[in-house]
């Protein structure tokens, strides 16, 4: 099971546990018993009580989410050598939590943080001990090219942002992060170049993401559909790519990028109809070669749209347009078909679509 899938299941367990006990109001002191009450029936929760320098310390963490080596070297070992010093000075990566926000504390716990209660000091700390497991950066299978970079996005938001930072080393690249999904608490990032992107469009995208109310997002296409202007339009209003070089080129054109943690794709907005005829390799070819390839794609579009209808129209209503020899052959072949041409064509199109869908969905191994 992927860490994100496991984490979603844990959030659901915590949501069930919250129904058994109310969260404390902001400013109220949080106790270890509250953590145990909220994390009721979560078997992978580890709860330890340590005595460090004659002081009792309660420790909470989730086994599958925490790297035990990091926990020992960055938390337990420094505390054992602290000699009664302030834990904030001993643990440089620790963050205090003194506002009584239990929901935030539970969210950090479910993200792989370790929670420490220093009861005598009335101090609560959380340390990021998350065990980072991610897929290696590989070639893009959906947008394979011969020329240009061969890397693609993965399911980790931080890695995807680093791939873009390596290409756009400018302070004008702005990254605004949000947390969406009432149950999944997905992290989503909005990227744009401040000196190029349209400010009105940027604010519009930010506002829509902030106003999204949904239980959880399992992928970027779900979020994409909730941000569209015209959800019933057959044409995509967001571009979707898994290549960092495509995203960098879109940012330089003034586009806005949306990246969701857990998704190996990035959404580009706004999108235009003509972009559907572009290939990632067009940027690395000469303009004449790229233009010729785009013209071929346009020609293929018109052939796809008009060929079937032209066949039915000529064969049914305008047979005089065909040469006599070809008309004779078609008439002989049609005499064995019990359906009119329009039914025949629809049946053939349906069979081809079924075969194509089966070829895509069938397991390859």
Model-derived segments and their meaning:
Residues 1-306, 324:
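Membrane-embedded alpha-helical signal segments
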Residues 272-365:
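Transmembrane alpha-helical segments that form the functional core of multipass membrane systems
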């Amino acid at each position: 099971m992927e860490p994100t899938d496991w984490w979603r299941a844990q959030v659901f367990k915590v949501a069930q546990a919250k129904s058994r006990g109310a969260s404390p109001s902001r400013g109220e002191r949080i106790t270890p018993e509250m953590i145990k009450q909220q994390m009721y029936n979560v078997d992978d929760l580890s709860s330890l009580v340590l005595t460090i320098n004659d002081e009792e310390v309660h420790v909470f963490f989730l086994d599958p989410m925490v790297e035990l080596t990091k926990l020992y070297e960055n938390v337990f070992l420094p505390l054992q050598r602290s000699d009664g010093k302030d834990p904030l000075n001993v643990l440089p990566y620790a963050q205090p939590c003194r506002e009584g926000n239990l929901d935030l504390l539970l969210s950090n716990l479910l993200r792989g943080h370790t929670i420490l209660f220093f009861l005598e000091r009335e101090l609560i700390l959380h340390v990021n001990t998350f065990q980072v497991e991610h897929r290696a950066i590989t070639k893009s299978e959906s947008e394979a090219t011969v020329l240009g970079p061969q890397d693609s996005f993965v399911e980790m938001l931080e890695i995807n942002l680093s791939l873009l930072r390596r290409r756009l080393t400018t302070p004008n690249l702005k990254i605004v992060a949000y947390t969406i999904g009432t149950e999944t608490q997905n992290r989503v990032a909005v990227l744009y170049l401040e000196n190029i992107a349209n400010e009105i469009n940027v604010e519009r995208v930010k506002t829509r993401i902030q106003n999204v109310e949904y239980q959880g997002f399992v992928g970027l296409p779900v979020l994409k559909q909730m941000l569209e202007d015209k959800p019933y339009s057959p044409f995509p209003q967001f571009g979707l790519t898994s290549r960092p070089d495509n995203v960098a080129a879109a940012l330089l054109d003034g586009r806005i990028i949306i990246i969701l943690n857990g998704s190996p794709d990035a959404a580009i907005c706004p999108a235009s109809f003509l972009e559907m005829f572009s290939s990632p390799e067009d940027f690395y070819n000469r303009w004449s070669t790229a233009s010729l390839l785009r013209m071929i794609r346009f020609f293929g579009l018109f052939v796809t749209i008009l060929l079937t209808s032209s066949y039915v129209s000529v064969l049914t209503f305008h047979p005089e347009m065909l040469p006599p020899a070809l008309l004779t052959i078609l008439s002989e072949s049609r005499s064995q078909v019990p359906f009119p041409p329009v039914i025949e064509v629809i049946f053939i199109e349906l069979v081809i679509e079924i075969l194509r869908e089966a070829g895509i969905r069938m397991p390859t191994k």
